[in-house]
């Protein structure tokens, strides 16, 4: 066993850029300490270890951010805007009454951070940096959602928080843009955040709230069956099957298995999306993520119901490749994100996915 672990470690270090390997390995080590065998979680230690950063009242690298706490739900969101779009009074305070633009369309990206429903937050340094890069590179406004985490808050708490965030964003005059004064909303997230984005989009579809598109970065899906990628990649690139199982037990309702629709959206108990106006999707799959088969099954599920889906498959990418701009996968992702959020024309559903090759 020790020899196998050493082989996996050496292979991982050979493929993954050193800075990224160190970063994600540190997360992996901390996560292992925080999870308890009885299903509980050391939240106090997690908060101590999670490096957080405040919002910045002065633009940093052309991006301004501020926090908002909803007085009704107590939900915190962090809003990132290009400094060029800020409206300030002559006293320097924010003026949140004017739209972002009355001529140009400015996409608003509602972002759900990853962490397997359990780790990180909207003000975690690593996600703060990532959201800033989204603003700078893609020319969007980002609203990062500090949703409630498991195991203290199980299904469907994170989805409910995502739904509340969507409705709050849609009601903000100062997030409107374009000649028709709309809020042009996209949902996005990585890992568990991608799962949340999908489920919020399903609810938006059911309740007639318009979302222009979904962006899912190696979304966290699964099922009872063990897939080939789970067997082949178990423990090789940062994550084990046991890790994933622990997080699903911590998030799903007590007594549920991994074929619950929250985990397996197109599984035996999943909701059919056939004939509904579900938004177009960009699904990013890392070829070294052990749950990639479930992500590809998700793409196939969208395809079979006639929905528009773009698949960006990055064969040599691992989870978290986008945290640092030290690899070609990062730049490929940003290029595709930029194109996706700026192609807001309503398109007809397509019968097959578009495979994007880096």
Swiss-Prot record:
Protein keywords: Acetylation, Gibberellin signaling pathway, Hydrolase, Nucleus, Receptor
Principal subcellular localization: nucleus
Membrane-crossing residue ranges in chain numbering: none
Active site: 191, 289
Tissue-wise expression: Widely expressed.
Disruption phenotype: No visible phenotype under normal growth condition.
Keyword Hydrolase: yes
Gene Ontology cellular-component terms listed: nucleus
Enzyme Commission (EC) number: 3.-.-.-
Gene Ontology biological-process entries: floral organ morphogenesis; fruit morphogenesis; gibberellin mediated signaling pathway; negative regulation of gene expression; positive regulation of fertilization; positive regulation of gibberellic acid mediated signaling pathway; response to gibberellin
List of residues binding gibberellin A4: 115-116, 127, 191, 320
Modified residues (N-acetylalanine): 2
Membership in a protein family: Belongs to the 'GDXG' lipolytic enzyme family.
Subunit structure: Interacts with the DELLA proteins GAI, RGA, RGL1, RGL2 and RGL3 in a GA-dependent manner.
General function of this protein: Functions as a soluble gibberellin (GA) receptor. GA is an essential hormone that regulates growth and development in plants. Binds with high affinity the biologically active gibberellin GA4, but has no affinity for the biologically inactive GAs. In response to GA, interacts with specific DELLA proteins, known as repressors of GA-induced growth, and targets them for degradation via proteasome. Seems to be required for GA signaling that controls root growth, seed germination and flower development. May function as a dominant GA receptor at low GA concentrations in germination.
Protein name: Gibberellin receptor GID1B
Species whose genome carries this gene: Arabidopsis thaliana (Mouse-ear cress)
